[in-house]
A protein has these predicted regions:
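Transmembrane-helix motifs of polytopic, lipid-linked glycan transferases
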Residues: 19, 23, 92-115, 153, ...
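Short acidic/glycine- and proline-prone juxtamembrane loop motifs at membrane-interface regions
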Residues: 40-41, 66-67, 133-146, 333
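Signature aromatic-anchored transmembrane alpha helix within multi-pass, membrane-resident enzymes
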Residues: 19, 119, 170, 187, ...
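Membrane-lumen/periplasm interface segments of specific transmembrane helices
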Residues: 28, 205-295
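Hydrophobic, aromatic-rich transmembrane alpha-helices
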Residues: 2, 106-108, 274-308, 315-319
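Hydrophobic/aromatic-rich transmembrane helices and adjacent perimembrane loops
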Residues: 144, 175-180, 184, 287, ...
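Membrane-embedded, lumen/periplasm-facing catalytic core of multi-pass transferases
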Residues: 372-431
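Membrane-interface alpha helices of multi-pass inner-membrane proteins
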Residues: 124-125, 157, 165-180, 186-190, ...
Length: 431
């Protein structure tokens, strides 16, 4: 029986295996999902913008969310469901984030297939499906999972050598509307497409059409952003971000950054600070699943380079730039590096593949590795993330709101105050 099971692991029906991984990922996330915890910070800002769109039936004319596509997407679902409590819509936002993180497994499998066969591609999506930090992040309801989905779709369609590659610029445009960091995804595929098409028939027309598709996607919201007071388009934000690194003799003026309600000064940005924190956080986010395999896989990719492998490396470098910028403040959060995780999964497959192929029973070894991945992930989540503390923090925040009129900051637990202090009556909130 055991021998038959291992032989069947040679994956003749990969769709069943993918669906099994999808189901396992969904079940694990729902186990840790707590409906009593509201959305907070950036996810709360997204929720507020979504409710505003839902209430007026269009984008507000007086302000624009810096990451508008996710709240626009949420507002469609807010229109479909009819809940009486605001908290129910917050939970809908979190559940949609969980579903998108699980759905990303499907295109990621076919992206892995560009480099490996079916059974090793399953290892890549399993790592992604149970990666502890991605699991925790998907429970928050923020933009990150939506953005990661578009990264995977961009790369998957870009590697297609038919006209489907044009879709990669559609997805890169959607990624940019989801988060401004998406423009770096666009830069990476635009550079690689130039080298892919160079010297071929209709090179210039194909290249310009690709760029045009991207700009058509982002232009409407970019124009709207420039017309809305105190709002920047993605290109204005890039220019202002670059300006942060240029020394100025004038007296510095504080500029507010939407992050945990903290004000940063322009002159606090330092390349040296970024160089200090970036490698430290890069190493930290690789624990526990990537730390032993992804660095090895990265160097093995470089050793036997081809255009597709080079595209992955170039994309990972470009997507690291926004993280380096964040750590230059420093904004000390690991989530700025989560956008690299789909590529990390692909890098991780190669050393696992080479290790298994050296064993006498590679399928059995591979099955053992996959079970170990799940075990390590669950163990890490159980010990690293204190979900009970978060639940208790919500209860404390409820007591504070009920019994006080003014509140002293006690971050990070106080992050729930703002979420719980809004009207819990959905009709009141929308009027």
């Amino acid at each position: 029986m055991s021998k038959q099971l291992v032989t069947q692991f040679d994956v003749k029906k990969p769709i069943m295996a993918i669906c099994s991984i999808f189901t396992a990922s969904l079940i694990l996330k729902l186990i840790f999902y707590d409906p009593s915890i509201p959305v907070v910070m950036d996810a709360l800002s997204t929720f507020s913008f979504s409710t505003h769109i839902h209430a007026i039936g269009q984008l507000p004319e007086n302000y624009l969310h810096p990451k508008p596509l996710w709240p626009m997407f949420l507002s469609l679902f807010f229109s479909v469901f009819d809940f009486s409590q605001t908290q129910s819509y917050m939970q809908l936002q979190k559940i949609l984030s969980i579903l998108i993180s699980c759905i990303t497994i499907f295109p990621l499998y076919y992206l892995c297939k560009k480099f490996f066969n079916s059974k090793y591609s399953l290892v890549g999506i399993l790592i992604f499906a149970v990666e502890p930090r991605l699991m925790e992040n998907s429970l928050m309801g923020g933009t990150d999972q939506f953005f990661i989905f578009f990264i995977v779709m961009t790369l998957l369609t870009f590697f297609n050598k038919t006209k489907i590659f044009y879709l990669s610029f559609v997805f890169a445009g959607l990624a940019t509307i989801t988060r401004p960091e998406g423009v770096f995804l666009f830069f990476s595929i635009a550079i690689m497409l130039f080298f892919r098409l160079r010297g071929k028939k209709l090179f210039l027309s194909k290249y310009l059409i690709s760029l045009l598709i991207f700009f058509i996607i982002i232009l409407p919201l970019s124009i709207h952003a420039e017309q809305v007071p105190n709002t920047e388009s993605v290109f204005s934000r890039i220019i202002s971000s670059i300006d942060q690194f240029i020394p100025s003799d004038t007296k510095p003026t504080p500029s507010e950054i939407s992050h945990n309600d903290i004000e940063f000064n322009k002159n606090t940005i330092s390349i040296l600070t970024g160089l200090e924190h970036f490698p430290k956080f890069l190493g930290w986010v690789m624990i526990p699943l990537f730390i032993l395999v992804t660095p090895i896989g990265f160097f093995l990719f470089i050793k036997k380079l081809n255009p597709d492998k080079l595209t992955l490396i170039v994309t990972s470098v470009f997507l690291s730039i926004p993280a380096f910028y964040a750590y230059s403040y420093p904004l000390l959060e690991t989530r700025y590096l989560y956008f690299l995780f789909p590529i990390f999964c692909i890098f991780a497959i190669l050393p696992i593949k080479l290790f298994c192929e050296k064993m006498r029973r590679p399928n059995l070894v591979l099955l053992g590795i996959m079970l170990m991945i799940i075990f390590i992930s669950v163990l890490f989540i159980s010990y690293q993330f204190d979900f009970q503390h978060e639940k208790e923090s919500v209860k404390v925040a409820e007591i504070v709101i009920e019994n006080t009129s003014s509140i002293n900051e006690y971050y990070p637990e106080s992050k729930y105050i703002k979420s719980l202090d809004i009207s819990q009556n959905w009709l009141e909130l929308n009027h």
